[in-house]
Amino acid sequence: MPLEKTNTHDSTATVEDQEATDNPMHLTQSRMLDLAGNPNRTTSRQSETLFPNGVDLNYPFTTTRGPPDVAEYNLETAEGVYRDPTINEGEEELVTWELNDPENPHNWSRLWKWYITIVNSLLVVCSAFGSSVIAGDLEDVSRDLKVGPEVANLSCSLMVVGFGIGPLVISPLSEMIGRRIVYLVTLMIYIVLQIPCALAPNIACLLIVRFFCGCFGCTPLTLAGGVISDVWETRERGLAIAFFAAGPYAGPTLGPLVGGWIGVGTGDFRWIFWVNMIYMFVMYLTLLPVPETYAPVLLRWRAQRIRKETGRQVFTAQEKQMLSFKEIVQVNLTRPLTLLLTEPILVCISGYIALIYALLYGYFFAYPNVFVKGKGYNEGITGLMFIPILVGVVGALSTTPFLEKQYMAKLDANNGKSVPEWRLVGMCIASPFIPTGLLIFAWTSFPRLIWIGPAFSGAPFGYGMVLFYFSANNYLIDVYQNYCASALAAKTMVRSAGGAAFPLFIDYMMDGMTRQWAFFLLGMVAVAAIPIPFTFYLFGDKIRARSKAAIV
């Protein structure tokens, strides 16, 4: 499926607006946007089946691949249906929300929206926590299963690999059958998989199951942003998205802290998996009251109900236009790889995010090297050294609403037309903090020096990490508005590859080069990457003009 150039950029979308905008099933939704009231909106592809005679831009419900905008699925009419003159199907009508429709997630109470937001954000933390919690007691894994540390490290890496593969199936599946059922089924499987992890008789069993834990446990990381977009209007969701953005990094940071104390207290790494199972099960119970939030699925259910009860021919565009299996595979697998090979913006931003994510997972193995091997601390005390990273995460969490407010002010001043490079402010602020933390860690990690230096190096790193991630996701969504799900899928694959790879060689790197020079080298790599957001801020418009997928 060739990439189609578009000049649509009137989006006010923020991060995760949806993380599946160009998912195959998402492409087939009736885009419920009144184009008469939004004249800047254009369609990049006219449907051959739903609109055989072309699309009149004076009518709503045109099939478009424009910017991700939740309002597209929020058109309200007095009767809850709209007869689109572009459909030559007699009396068939398209279903909409009714005025002030109580089933429309945007009309739910703020208290209920915040419950959904907090539950989804905590599920992200819980899922990410599960990937790194075993890092707190890998020494016991090596001893009990009689393997070397490099093999034991795979129990962390393979779950992160699963994080990169699982979304390729989970994302399109959620668009077809709804987010809730995918959440409930996959997380229950994830909970059950903790049992063979805890009872694993050998390392092969543990590693295989940990990979599948990543494939099924990635659901919150994949869907939570979309759920938040489902229930909040664009201008309301800044703080909600900030909570979500912290989760993928707060969770892994908490893992070694908790896992270390479990290992110290029990002397058995298997208890880590029992505790993780209990933790996710408690979170699973909080998810049960949350209903389906994805508007296209809710409207499809409504159309089916109306047809069954009244015989009235009411449909959604999703029902009228289905993609072939080949198209589904093409969008979800081929396009992310195509973008990675052809889009310099995506390559650079994804590579930067992968570096940060890899460094975070590198810390999980660097801290034991410094504090256990170098200073003689136990795993529990070493876990406490991750607290400054969490302090930095909280600092970034406090900053993101101000960035959103600044962005919205620029948007209003520009008559609602966005410039993607406005999103780069947060990345420009964040990028110097990352090498700062690494260099502090490098030259304070001598065994003879007090613990404060290497421990508190995590604060600037944690701050820059989350602030960069938040802004980078926003930027990719704004740049690749028509293909943002593919862009984000590509970013996730690269990020997961980085996070999975670093634990496999970081110990060798520190032992071979010394801790100081190893992290000095990594710090210099991060310094070399600082110009990336500044370059795109200055020249991003020119780079986008040469792109086949980015908006101009």
UniProtKB/Swiss-Prot annotation:
GO MF annotations, alphabetized: spermine transmembrane transporter activity
The yes or no answer to whether the keyword Glycoprotein is present is: no
How does the record say this protein sits in the membrane?
Multi-pass membrane protein
Q: Give the residue ranges for region: Disordered.
A: 1-59
Which top-rank group of organisms is this from? Eukaryota
A GO CC annotation given for this chain:
fungal-type vacuole membrane
| Record bears the keyword Transport | yes
Gene3D superfamilies assigned to the protein according to its UniProt record, in alphabetical order: MFS general substrate transporter like domains
**What are the subcellular locations of this protein?**
Membrane
Which BP terms from GO are recorded?
A: export across plasma membrane; spermine transmembrane transport; spermine transport; transmembrane transport; xenobiotic transport
TM ranges are 116-136, 158-178, 181-201, 203-223, 238-258, 271-291, 345-365, 383-403, 424-444, 450-470, 484-506, 519-539
What main location does UniProt list?
membrane
Keyword annotations = Membrane, Transmembrane, Transmembrane helix, Transport
Sequence ranges of Polar residues compositional bias: 39-50
The UniProt similarity line reads: Belongs to the major facilitator superfamily.
Protein known as: Uncharacterized MFS-type transporter SPBC409.08
Q: Which organism is it from?
A: Schizosaccharomyces pombe (strain 972 / ATCC 24843) (Fission yeast)
